[in-house]
Amino acid sequence: MSEGTVSLSGRWRLWDQVAVRGTGFPANGVLRLAPEGLAAAADKFGPRDALSGAAWKAFEEEFVRAAALAAADAQEIAASGRFRAAVAWQNRGVLDSAIRPFLNWSPETAGRTFKQRQREELVAHYWQRFCVKNDTIGFFGPVGWGAFDTARPGVTVEPGSGPTASSEVFWSSWSVDALAREIDADPAVRPWTAPRRVPYVRLEENAVRIPARPPRPVPPETLRLLRLCDGTRSVPALQRELGPDADVPALLDELVRLRWITWRLEVPADIRPDRRLRAALERIGEPGPRAAALARMDELESAVEGVRAAAEDPERLVAALTAVEQTFQRVTEAAAKREKSTTTAPGRAVVYSDSRRAARVTLGGDVL
């Protein structure tokens, strides 16, 4: 048990590997939107001081100058390709509705209207989030790795080369499930979907027992079929086991009705659910249905490759994400984004991006 762990006092131990969370933009970048000296100038006025006179007039003039500088900084931030790419992953709709109009705005000619202040605040909101909030998302919220080493005294950081060591685009599990449901609706695919017995069904010598129910006698043929429903055998394989006289599809339909088995194309939980689905489709024994099912998946995978190729180019990324959603809707006939709610897990879009931070951190004995 001691291998791979760090001992603490008493019986406590820690795993020697740790995840390092942080932002993908420099933390001090947030100070760009804090005009130097403005807060100190405002502090000169107490709660009972009259907001008038020469001193107040000077502060108003300073505030106007600071606001103009902050707006210029916000425009420079919004023009950055990495910033717009990060926003594209979060909410690409605001790129056209807010970011683009803000970049086309000239404070010297149009003035700081309410609408432009709202857009400036939106840029500031995203910039603060990207600089100082430890989101775990894409290149603007990468996750790194570190380790405990009690032989060292403090904290050691190896910065690596660049902010991220690697980035990858993954399918959301729900989007693969939606694709599996659509493919499973094809009657030609179902015989090649392996049924499995549900976990709470217990098989006895000549009966089936489920929780809170008395044993239910079943025919030997049904009991044998239940034993064979292990999630690996297709209908043709089950038919070979039971012989030509058994009506396996009818028996399976009855077991589904009794809720003793699950008979559908299921995708196990996995960081790469698309690979699990592809492996299941490649096991379809008939060339026609197999090719048709894989063609649907290939069409979606081709669109996802476009997202990978876009990387941090905001224009290409927006086009690629749009293409993924349009392809997904056409192939699955399902919505390309899940509505946010208290029961919705992270990953509401069809695909998401994760990145690994280039830096590596070592925590020494003084930290413990």
Predicted segments, located by residue:
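Type-3 copper protein
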Residues: 1-163, 220-221, 228, 247-368
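Extended, Lys/Arg-enriched charged tracts that mediate electrostatic binding to polyanionic substrates
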Residues: 140, 147-202
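Composition- and surface-driven signal marking solvent-exposed, interaction-prone regions
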Residues: 169, 240-241, 249-253
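Catalytic cores of large soluble enzymes that bind and process phosphate-bearing ligands
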Residues: 171, 217, 230
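A general structural signal for short secondary-structure junctions and capping/turn motifs
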Residues: 189-193, 215, 253
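Short alpha-helical segments that sit at the start of domains
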Residues: 194-224
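Short acidic (Asp/Glu) and glycine-rich catalytic loops that position anionic groups and cofactors
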Residues: 204-206, 232-236, 278-281, 355
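Short capping segments at the starts of secondary-structure elements
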Residues: 226-237, 241, 245
